[in-house]
UniProtKB/Swiss-Prot annotation:
Family, as annotated: Belongs to the methyltransferase superfamily. RsmH family.
Record's catalysed reaction(s): cytidine(1402) in 16S rRNA + S-adenosyl-L-methionine = N(4)-methylcytidine(1402) in 16S rRNA + S-adenosyl-L-homocysteine + H(+)
Keywords: Cytoplasm, Methyltransferase, rRNA processing, S-adenosyl-L-methionine, Transferase
GO MF terms held by the record: rRNA (cytosine-N4-)-methyltransferase activity
InterPro entries recorded: RsmH, SAM-dep_MeTrfase_MraW_recog, SAM-dependent_MTases_sf
Full protein name: Ribosomal RNA small subunit methyltransferase H
Originating organism: Ruegeria pomeroyi (strain ATCC 700808 / DSM 15171 / DSS-3)
Length: 331
């Protein structure tokens, strides 16, 4: 396949912000890592734009099974790696670019049996890798206080205590096992949404999915891994879909670009102060009217892009970049 050829027209997934992403990181060449392969939209876009090779990472083995039909067309230009993007520096080094799309794959949302959607009935699962405790395990065993904490900090759900109380009361009668069962329970705790507002269960499902898959830990570790894996001049592009993860990415890049400030601005810059990234866009890039018309899913998406400098990789405190802190403990 030609390096400049457009992605195949039968692509079932519309990658969010692909056009502005490719424009922001142009020219595309060398070795890139797509840390959230999903349906392969970004990978195909990068290969079509001129990447010599893309290392595609996904924790869900089904993603690679579904891509097998078209992936072979790219030969050794496409390398598939089952795993998590927080370990990308174990899979590759001296990368020319890293792309992370933090949204849920449309493939996973479309499969009722994966348990991500409150619009389709299925087992209350939500595991991206299909390993470890499921959302049903969490909902049916966590304490009321822990459930409220997760819903509030991970989903920014103001009615977290009310919903947690309802969950504990309901599961005392019978286990909560399906997506629609949980969605109906959440709906019963909240006012009916006005036209144009999101489904009442949106925030609760987001919070539980994040908890089940340790998504904030994965994002924090992934940003640090990208810093280690990128070569000087390498580009990092991250697409976020809600305020908490965007805040984490924004603060991380600001801190690593030296915008968190030195103790004394007149003091000489030290090796420790040297920025690891240069911001390629001061503000997040959002969808234009054309993309919103083509793909309503893009309405909340934000893209942030940065360039890796030659400063040594370092460490960052998770709390300092706005990672939610649960009372019971993660980071």
């Amino acid at each position: 396949m030609s390096r400049t050829a457009a992605p195949p027209s039968d692509d079932p997934h519309i990658p969010v912000l692909l056009r502005p992403l490719l424009a922001a990181v142009a020219p595309v060449s060398g070795i890139w890592l797509d840390g959230t392969f999903g349906a392969g939209g970004y990978t195909r876009g990068l290969l079509a734009a001129g990447a010599d090779r893309v290392i595609a990472v996904d924790r869900d083995p089904l993603a690679f099974e579904l891509a097998a039909g078209w992936a072979k067309d790219y030969g050794d230009r496409l390398v598939m790696q089952q795993g998590v993007f927080s370990r990308m520096d174990e899979y590759a080094s001296d990368l020319d670019g890293v792309v992370l799309d933090l949204g849920v794959s449309s493939m996973q949302l479309d499969l009722a049996e994966r348990g991500f959607s409150f619009m389709k009935d299925g087992p209350l699962d939500m595991r991206m890798s299909q390993e470890g405790p499921s959302a049903a395990d969490l909902v049916n065993t966590a304490t009321e206080a822990d459930l409220a904490d997760i819903l509030f900090h991970y989903g920014e759900e103001r009615a977290s205590r009310r919903i947690a109380r309802a969950i504990v009361k309901a599961r005392a009668e019978a286990p909560i096992e399906t997506t629609l069962q949980l969605a109906a329970l959440v709906e019963s705790c909240l006012p009916r949404p006005k036209p144009g507002q999101s489904h009442p269960a949106t925030r609760s499902f987001q919070a539980l999915r994040i908890a089940v898959n340790a998504e904030y830990d994965e994002l924090f570790e992934g940003l640090m891994a990208a810093e280690r894996a990128l070569k000087p001049g390498g580009k990092l592009a991250v697409v976020t879909f809600h305020s908490i993860e965007d805040r984490m990415v924004k603060r991380f890049l600001q801190a690593r670009a030296g915008r968190s400030g030195r103790a004394n601005r007149y003091a000489p810059e030290t090796v420790e102060d040297a920025p690891q990234f240069e911001l390629l866009s001061r503000k997040a890039i959002g969808p234009d009217d054309q993309e919103l018309a083509e793909n309503p899913r893009a309405r909340s998406a934000k893209l942030r892009v940065a360039l890796r400098t030659d400063a040594p990789a370092g460490a960052v405190d998770a709390k300092s970049i706005g990672m939610p802190q649960l009372k019971g403990g993660t980071r």
